[in-house]
Regions:
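Beta-propeller fold recognition
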Residues: 1-266
């Protein structure tokens, strides 16, 4: 939930930006989609948009602010890039609403992990999504997170760690630095600030996970500024989907890693 300033009547002929309170949510294990609701008046909430990735029927379904449904087939040639959510998995990752600079203009966006793929389907889940909240949820950017050379089918079910100036005075930038943890045990740092190259990414840490040692990351890295004035990320590994599983090969760990470049990207 976030207060954002935007034109919530995009289909009329006037530009009418105003402050609105937006609730943006995913379907969790129930599906591969998201929805947005204007809850400025909590007694009269209104639908803004909804998106669903129907990978069974190979189509993207989109409902606009008026409730009108559009459908885009994967292979039909009708896929508009602004609706290309084909890589979206089960939407476990909580969307974070932030303001970043795109092409010189400030823009309200949502950023979230690609979701869960059951650790079996490489076609979706292994990405970070950028959604344009000023354009009815249309896709702004997909940042792919590559698979490592191991036997894990990668995805990003975890919430992202999103560091902005609202959270720490050490963030001497506009926008956000984002840290994404994936099933392969990697931490990827993504630049969504006004400094350096927008959408640039780098692997900050690799726990060398395999299906044998079980070092999956399902949960968000928790961030803090330590007494060295550097940003540290703390997280643990483990398979939250098989809590009763026992194996002598399992080698889960708890990590604390320092981003020595913070508040810069590199």
């Amino acid at each position: 939930v976030k207060d954002i300033y935007f034109d919530d009547t995009p289909n009329d002929s006037t530009n009418n930006p105003r402050w609105r309170t937006i609730l943006l949510g995913g379907l969790g294990a129930g599906g591969k989609g998201l929805y947005a609701i204007d809850i400025t008046d909590v007694n009269n909430p209104t639908h803004l948009f909804a998106i669903n990735n129907d990978n069974t029927n190979q189509s993207i379904q989109y409902w606009d602010i008026d409730g009108l449904k559009q459908e885009f087939g994967y292979a039909s040639g009708s896929m508009d890039p602004k609706y290309d959510y084909r890589k979206l998995g089960e939407t476990w990752s909580t969307p974070r609403i932030i303001r970043i600079k795109v092409s010189g203009k400030d823009k309200w966006v949502a950023v979230f992990g690609g979701g869960y793929n059951g650790a079996v389907n490489p076609n979706y889940g292994s990405a970070v999504f950028m959604m344009d909240l000023e354009d009815e949820g249309r896709l702004l950017k997909v940042i792919d997170i590559e698979d490592s050379a191991n036997n894990i089918v990668n995805s990003i079910p975890a919430d992202l760690s999103v560091i902005t100036a609202d959270g720490t005075e050490k963030a001497t930038y506009n926008g956000a630095l984002v840290y994404a943890a994936d099933l392969e045990g990697k931490i990827t740092k993504i630049n969504l600030t006004d400094q350096g190259t927008l959408y640039q990414k780098t692997t900050l840490f690799n726990s060398e996970s395999t299906s044998d040692n079980g070092r999956y990351i399902y949960k968000k890295p928790e961030a803090t500024i330590n007494n060295d004035n550097k940003l540290w990320l703390y997280f643990g590994t483990g398979n939250t989907q098989k809590l009763q599983e026992q194996s002598s090969q399992t080698q889960n760990r708890v990590y604390g890693i320092k981003d020595k470049d913070f508040p810069n990207f590199v």
